[in-house]
């Protein structure tokens, strides 16, 4: 079972003005996202998830992806 990838917003460039730059794959999930999903950094790394300790944002789509992944692991019989 493939672990989910973190999705983060691209940096906003001043020369482009107020245009939304979109999203991209991130380095890992933030500690806040892990906490909302009920995990800590050590447990997340054991489950094969990447953790980015520098990032402070909490994106709802990442929290939802983590919750779905944990649910699939529990259905497969993995202790979370």
UniProtKB/Swiss-Prot annotation:
Keywords: Ribonucleoprotein, Ribosomal protein. GO terms for molecular function: structural constituent of ribosome. GO terms for cellular component: ribonucleoprotein complex; ribosome. Signal peptide: none annotated. InterPro entries: Ribosomal_eL13, Ribosomal_eL13_CS. GO terms for biological process: translation. PROSITE patterns: RIBOSOMAL_L13E. Belongs to the eukaryotic ribosomal protein eL13 family. HAMAP family: Ribosomal_eL13. This is Large ribosomal subunit protein eL13.
């Amino acid at each position: 079972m493939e672990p989910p990838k973190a999705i983060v917003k691209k940096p906003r460039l001043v020369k482009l003005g107020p245009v939304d730059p979109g999203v991209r794959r991130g380095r890992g999930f933030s500690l806040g996202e892990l906490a909302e999903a009920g995990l800590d950094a050590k447990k997340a790394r054991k489950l094969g998830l990447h953790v980015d300790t520098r990032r402070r944002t909490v994106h709802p789509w990442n929290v939802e992806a983590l919750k779905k992944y944990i649910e699939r692991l529990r259905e497969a019989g993995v202790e979370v």
